[in-house]
Each structure stands twice: as C-alpha cells, then as structure tokens.
Amino acid sequence: MGRGKITARRPVAPDSKYNSVVVTRFIGRMMLSGKKSITTKIMYDSFDKIKEKTGEEPLAVFSKALDNVKPVVEVKSRRVGGATYQVPMDIPEGRREALAMRWIIGAARKRSGHEMSERLASELIDAYNNTGTAFKKKEEVHRMAEANKAFAHFRW
C-alpha cells in the first residue's frame, strides 16, 4: 500500500426531485455504462408506480424497504490452524446499505417483466412488506451467521 495521504471522500449531491443522498447513491449503483439520465428516469418512474400501487409516500416506502433488507451480521472466512471457519461478524453501516442496495437491484433485474421501473417498484414494495428475493437473501445471510455462532470467538 502506498504511503500517500488518505484522500477525503467526495460528498454525494442529493437528487433533484426528492433531495435525498440515499436515492442518489441508489441511482449510482443501478447505473449501467454511465447512463445516469436513463437510470434516474427508471428510478423516478418506479417511485411513481409505488405511489400508484401503495398510495403511500414513495421515499418512505423506499427507505423502509432498504431498512428491511439491510443485514446486521454476515459470515467471513477465517483460517485458523488448518481449518477455515465461517465466522459471524457485525457489518458497518456503509456496507449494510451497500449490500441492501445491491440485493434489491439484483433481485429487480432477475424479476420477470417488461420495464425495469416496474420490476424495481415491485421489488421495493415486496421489501417494504418483508417479502421478496432481496429480503430472502438477508434472511439467508442471517441464518448462516446464526448457524456459525459457535465460531464467533474467532472474531478479531
């Protein structure tokens, strides 16, 4: 690793419509090949569809869905002696958010349907209701951590 100074993280500008930094980060993660305007349109269209389907504030549904999918613990491989153990570890807030976003976007892309905005809206509504593929992924990660609780003392 270099010995240069550590650069400060660039601040993320909030999005224009909802004035939310989290929405901007989500758009950035969802973007393919630098097509930000297309991704932003998909995001806002899916928010309109959420408002239409649930009748609730889309930003509130989005943030609750994100909170429902955020994992608290995950397993990491640790080599001790000749054996490799899956050790449960707490996750820092930034990684929790990143994983939740990644899982929601991945689940929306795998869904069957025509428009990405429709698939994303459906996945966000499912995550809001504690169902759906992204929520199942979180449950699976938590189950793995619970199953390997015996190795928690290898944490360092």
From Swiss-Prot:
Signal peptide: none annotated. CDD domains: uS7_Bacteria (cd14869). HAMAP family: Ribosomal_uS7_B. This is Small ribosomal subunit protein uS7. One of its GO terms (cellular component) is small ribosomal subunit. Belongs to the universal ribosomal protein uS7 family. PROSITE patterns: RIBOSOMAL_S7 (PS00052). PANTHER family: RIBOSOMAL PROTEIN S7 (PTHR11205). One of the primary rRNA binding proteins, it binds directly to 16S rRNA where it nucleates assembly of the head domain of the 30S subunit. Is located at the subunit interface close to the decoding center, probably blocks exit of the E-site tRNA. GO terms for biological process: translation. GO terms for molecular function: rRNA binding; structural constituent of ribosome; tRNA binding. It holds the Pfam family Ribosomal_S7. The gene is rpsG. NCBIfam families: rpsG_bact. Keywords: Ribonucleoprotein, Ribosomal protein, RNA-binding, rRNA-binding, tRNA-binding. The keyword Iron does not apply. It comes from the Bacteria. The keyword Cytoplasm does not apply. Part of the 30S ribosomal subunit. Contacts proteins S9 and S11. It comes from Treponema denticola (strain ATCC 35405 / DSM 14222 / CIP 103919 / JCM 8153 / KCTC 15104).
